[in-house]
Amino acid sequence: MTDIRPFRIDIPQPDIDDLRDRLTRARWTPALPGAEWSKGVPVDYLRELAQYWANEFDWRKIEAELNQFPQFVTEIQGQPIHFKHIRSERPDAPALLLLHDNPGGAMGLLDILEPLSRDFHLVVPFMPGFGFSTPLTSIGWTVPRVAAVFAELMDRLGYERFGAHGGGGGANVSLELGRQVPERLIGLHVNAYVAMPGEDVEGLTEAEQARMATVERFMQDGFGFNIMMSTRPQTIAHSLNDSPIGLLAWVVEKFGEWSDPAAQLPEQAIAKDRMLTDVSIQWFTGTSGSIAQSYHDVAHDPGAWGPKDRVTVPTAFVLSAGDVTIRRWAERDANVARWTEFDRGGAYIALEAPELVITDIREFFENRP
């Protein structure tokens, strides 16, 4: 099937009522002795956030905001792919593919869409198995396969040449597009990209050494999220799909841990309603299992961890205060055409400081052929 069908988000009211009912009937776990953020989301914090979700968060308002942009669904490789397609009023505008991370989903790019649509034709898909790109119809959604699907999507929309921006997992897919279809790309723009460390560690700056230490701490103390989903996706799916409290804790912890390191609480970096929009989409679509499956697919891809061809497409790297990329290893992976470091923000900088991302994207692509 190559047809493209209009799509509109319209969550049934009984689903919204069921969510609120579950939140108000939560069976709260007792707080562990000495439990602070280092052990996970504190009970008192989560209880207050859950009450806000149940009583103050307005899903219908968010739904209207999400529906302000044209949305569509198509099928590629047997998989439904949901995407926003926002045409610029500029007839000569270049096309820009925007790729999300997790948590965050395509919602994590919401605040940069209207400003960027003045200068670009935007295509904003959900990854297979995320959000409304469901149900997941097969396994094996490796980074190369996802990249091939999005290259096909851009072809289907009539964009022979385009740019791509991605953060985190979206950065990995963006760079893979640079390997698969370099002749079609006018440039790549990425943030929250993690370049695998090399052996050349001599001469690292103090800032680079601090980034290495952050990665080491994450591997020791923060990698459980990835390990659980990449090894037992079905097991964790049972918990997250049936308990909105469990899902809320699972997602909000990552927003807190991976956002601006200066923030003491997640909402000091990312607005509550933005975090709850992502959690709500995951809840209403029932995609906890398919999201976990995507981690399993990537982790079990034999080609994921070995050497890769260097990306020759001009690539801009954006580093927030919480990023860990080291330039010499980024240059090993890609043709670094622009390198921008900010003193604030984290992995979700498009949510935390959208104006920084908007400006950097515009400046980078302004003179790309």
What are these regions (language model features)?
Residues 59-61, 107, 127-141, 175, ...:
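Glycine-rich "HGGG/HGxG" loop immediately N-terminal to the catalytic nucleophile
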Residues 102-113:
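The serine-hydrolase catalytic nucleophile loop
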